[in-house]
């Protein structure tokens, strides 16, 4: 859903136009620079000191929106978005208004306010369907179709005992890396799901499993993006159980069979964003071979934020901050062309080779180099990963991809806490 991530870029155009009409204070200029820079950690640190000095109220509302979405304070983001779209439409150009509406629609989906999300998606589709290609429209179609199909479905919620809950984990070798699994029971059927922070909405399951588990199909032709844009069905269940945790009203994307992918590996399900977020904190204890869901959530300073429902972790490499996607469903960490551009010395002299990447929509061949040792600071400690591929060219020449921390990153720790309540990871 790349469209909901365009806000930072749209702001640049808006602020340049805005300054020609209104005089700006120093605080306004500084706030605009921070917002356009797109560094949420800088915004979080400097916003409290700037807020009262900013004369353009809309800038504060945009900051509240970005911080609310990025640091998982969805209700705060909802209030700011409502105010922006109700009272500041005339101060925004068309692209910025679209970006704000898209953020609001996705925020509605994440809050379980499906009917409202469907209406926002429908409005965006109707406004744009005759002027933009489907590749620019599909995320709004997703919003419309999912919101409308779930309009009468209660929002999901987690029921749990007042104690720590432990659930066994398992690890299996897949291709060039590993998958980390967690047992999930739906309608009396227990299967191992891939534990995947990179799955950005609901859960992702195979069509075969959906039939076996008796999932209720509520819609089809839902567009999603993987290796390419494809279509899935949408399904629901009354609940799913993970140990002593009961997650009510879960949502599932049901993928059709794919002979190319199925020839490499098969899967039943992928546990995604909504449950992981609502669990608040999950400790992956690799030594004990289990997941721990603590009753009391840990405190900590953020080193992670959400972008399109996917966590991005701030690491430090070569004494510089760098953000990587935390994608526990990726069998092995990889680095992208953004890393190659910022740290060219790291890959200098490394031989290029062909490698493959797979996911929903198929398998593609790409050119990469292999970094023998990737040493960086993250999660409160020093981490070393081995034989990390660096993809020097993205599929789109305009696209900069930073990279992702995959299963090998998770398994490099004795224990790794993933905390969505306070937006941090911490390892030992």
Residue ranges: model-predicted function:
Residues 23-428:
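Pepsin/retropepsin-fold aspartyl endopeptidases
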Residues 1-28:
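Bacterial Sec-dependent N-terminal signal peptides
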């Amino acid at each position: 859903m790349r469209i909901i991530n365009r806000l930072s870029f749209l702001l640049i155009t808006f602020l340049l136009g805005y300054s020609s009409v209104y005089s700006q204070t120093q605080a306004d200029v500084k706030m605009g620079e921070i917002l356009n820079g797109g560094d949420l950690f800088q915004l979080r640190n400097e916003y409290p000191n700037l807020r009262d000095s900013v004369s353009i109220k809309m800038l504060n509302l945009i900051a509240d929106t970005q911080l609310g979405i990025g640091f998982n304070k969805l209700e705060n983001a909802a209030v700011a978005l409502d105010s922006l779209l109700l009272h500041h439409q005339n101060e925004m150009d068309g692209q910025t208004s679209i970006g704000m509406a898209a953020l609001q629609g996705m925020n509605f989906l994440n809050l379980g306010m499906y009917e409202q999300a469907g209406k926002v998606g429908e409005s965006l589709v109707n406004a744009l369907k005759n002027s933009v290609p489907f590749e620019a429209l599909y995320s709004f179609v997703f919003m419309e179709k999912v919101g409308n199909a779930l309009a009468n479905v209660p929002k999901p919620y987690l029921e749990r005992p007042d104690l720590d809950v432990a659930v066994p984990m398992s690890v299996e070798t897949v291709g060039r890396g590993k998958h980390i699994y967690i047992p999930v029971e739906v309608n009396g059927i227990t299967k191992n799901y891939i534990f995947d922070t990179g799955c950005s909405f609901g859960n992702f399951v195979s069509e075969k499993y959906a039939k076996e588990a008796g999932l209720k199909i509520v819609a089809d032709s839902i567009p999603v993006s993987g290796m390419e844009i494809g279509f899935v069905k949408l399904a629901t269940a009354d609940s799913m159980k993970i140990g002593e945790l009961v997650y009510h009203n879960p949502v599932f994307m049901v993928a059709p069979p794919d002979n190319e992918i199925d020839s490499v590996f098969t899967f039943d399900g992928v546990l995604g964003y909504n449950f992981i977020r609502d669990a608040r904190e999950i400790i992956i204890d690799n030594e004990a071979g289990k997941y721990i869901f603590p009753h009391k959530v840990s405190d900590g300073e953020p080193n992670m934020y959400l972008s399109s429902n996917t966590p991005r972790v701030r690491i430090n490499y070569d004494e510089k901050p760098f953000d990587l996607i935390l994608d526990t469903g990726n069998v092995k960490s990889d680095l992208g062309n953004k890393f190659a551009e910022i740290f060219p010395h790291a890959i200098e002299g490394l031989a290029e080779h062909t490698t493959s990447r797979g996911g929903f929509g198929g398998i593609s061949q790409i050119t990469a180099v292999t970094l023998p040792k990737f040493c960086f600071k993250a999660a409160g400690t020093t981490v070393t990963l081995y034989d990390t591929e660096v993809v020097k060219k993205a599929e789109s020449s305009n696209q900069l991809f930073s990279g992702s921390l995959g299963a090998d990153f998770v398994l490099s720790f004795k224990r790794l806490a993933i905390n969505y309540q306070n937006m941090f990871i911490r390892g030992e």
